[in-house]
């Protein structure tokens, strides 16, 4: 049976290898025109532009802190955060607060790690941040903080690469940390020390609304803050076998997922930056985060429909009605070439190399952009497609970098609509992706608009970006 099957396949292969029919009409010598399968390859030109999203929803995995100045713009990032209350905890009756310290741990930085930045911290004294509300990076600080209630004794000068307050984690690795002492004579210290018990988070938020953390010196470093905590050191005494015994203890208040944290990002002269970038569109487009500057790509859907259906004529009836084959887009490969990947040593980095391309870029329908993130949707082949920065080689063996997207399913659906638009506008957006693994399958479980610092320079549509299509009909 196996030998017989092999013989049949071998004969079929010989027949196919001897066939000289045009690939656009495979098998046309065997089928009538109405029964033939049509396969066509085409390339369609595109247009691209940059768009300013003004602000993005602040929902980062880590918080940015600092200021950075490059040709991709100058921005300053600071943090508004609540602290989680240890619900149900109360200090011992005779406890006395000795000191309060603020800590934050950072896992990386962007820019010049040897350049100093000065950190200031203030108490939030305006509106209470709402845990159930989404905030954008252009949050109005004046509604939440007057900057009249400093928390620290002095500004804290930090050099990111020196890791002055590093601690060892469970794996034995040193984790960079910054320790800042509160001013024990401040109104903040007196009021916080007077809070003796902690009932609910809501009650605590009314007594202590949170912290505003900013830098007011340095424009060459932005720190990726991973964790923020405030430690209250206190002592109390008790009688033990007739002897007065003193115990030193501490209670830690964390900024975590149980409270609201907002990253405010301010771009200086952003409109001028947008104009400068748009002036370069003959060769390049840009996607810059957290600026919210994205690139849009217009797909010529109407032109595609007309071209595709010109190859799909099945038959013409006596009354002049034309019957068409049902079209399928088998392959629609969009490649986005990236042109600013730095591959040298860190010592050779220039200021404009600090911002590197986003590792993950999503191509989403522009009309669905806001809804996608507001409703925490997941990518699918008909609305949003995720691509990773990929390395390849050119014909000379030199490294090239790109994102790749297969739009076959999306275009098949769009081309079958009754009213096909002239163009379909798509948007390139940097995203952070979370995955989940079930048995042997890994799936995307969440997608958030990335707030990490990145700048992606791509070849523009005017500089040769195109869409390659292979489509068929039967």
Task: Map each language-model feature to its residues.
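Secreted, disulfide-rich extracellular signaling modules
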Residues: 2-9, 13, 18-474
């Amino acid at each position: 049976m196996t030998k017989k099957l092999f013989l049949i396949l071998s004969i079929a292969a010989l027949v196919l290898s001897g066939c000289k029919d045009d690939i656009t009409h495979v098998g046309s010598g065997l089928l009538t025109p109405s029964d033939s399968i049509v396969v066509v390859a085409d390339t369609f030109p595109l247009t691209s532009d940059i768009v300013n999203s003004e602000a993005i929803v602040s929902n980062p995995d880590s918080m940015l802190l600092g200021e950075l100045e490059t040709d991709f713009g100058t921005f300053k990032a600071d943090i508004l955060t609540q602290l989680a209350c240890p619900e149900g905890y109360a200090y011992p009756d005779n406890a006395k607060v000795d000191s309060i310290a603020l800590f934050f741990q950072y896992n990386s930085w962007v820019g010049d790690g040897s350049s100093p930045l000065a950190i200031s911290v203030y108490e939030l004294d305006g509106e209470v941040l709402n845990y159930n509300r989404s905030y954008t990076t252009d949050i109005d600080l004046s509604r939440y903080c007057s900057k009249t209630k400093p928390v620290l004794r002095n500004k804290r000068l930090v050099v990111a690469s020196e890791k002055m307050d590093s601690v060892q984690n469970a794996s034995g690795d040193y984790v960079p940390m910054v320790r800042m002492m509160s001013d024990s004579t401040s109104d903040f210290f007196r009021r916080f020390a007077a809070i003796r018990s902690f009932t609910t988070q809501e009650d605590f938020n009314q007594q202590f609304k949170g912290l505003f953390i900013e830098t007011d010196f340095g424009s060459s470093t932005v720190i990726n803050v991973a964790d923020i905590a405030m430690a209250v050191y206190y002592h109390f005494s008790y009688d033990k076998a007739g002897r007065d015994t003193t115990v030193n203890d501490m209670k830690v208040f964390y900024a975590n997922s149980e409270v609201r944290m907002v990253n405010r990002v301010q771009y200086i002269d952003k409109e001028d930056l947008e104009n400068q970038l748009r002036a370069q569109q003959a060769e390049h487009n840009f996607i810059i985060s957290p600026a919210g500057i994205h690139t849009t790509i217009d797909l010529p859907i109407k032109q595609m429909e007309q071209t595709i259906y010109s190859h799909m004529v099945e038959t013409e009836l006596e009354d002049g009605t034309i019957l068409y084959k049902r079209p399928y887009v088998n392959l629609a490969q969009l490649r986005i070439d990236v042109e600013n990947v730095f591959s040298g040593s860190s010592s050779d980095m220039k200021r404009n190399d600090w911002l590197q391309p986003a590792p993950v870029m999503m191509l989403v329908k522009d009309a669905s952009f806001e809804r996608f993130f507001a409703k925490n949707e997941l990518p699918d082949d008909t609305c949003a497609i995720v691509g990773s920065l990929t390395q390849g080689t050119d014909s000379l063996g030199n490294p090239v970098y790109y994102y790749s997207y297969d739009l076959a399913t999306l275009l098949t659906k769009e081309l079958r609509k009754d009213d096909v638009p002239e163009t379909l506008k798509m948007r390139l957006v940097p995203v952070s992706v979370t995955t989940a693994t079930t048995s042997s399958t890994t799936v995307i479980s969440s997608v958030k608009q990335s707030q990490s610092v990145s700048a992606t320079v791509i070849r523009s549509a005017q500089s040769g970006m195109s869409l390659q299509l292979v489509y068929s009909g039967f």
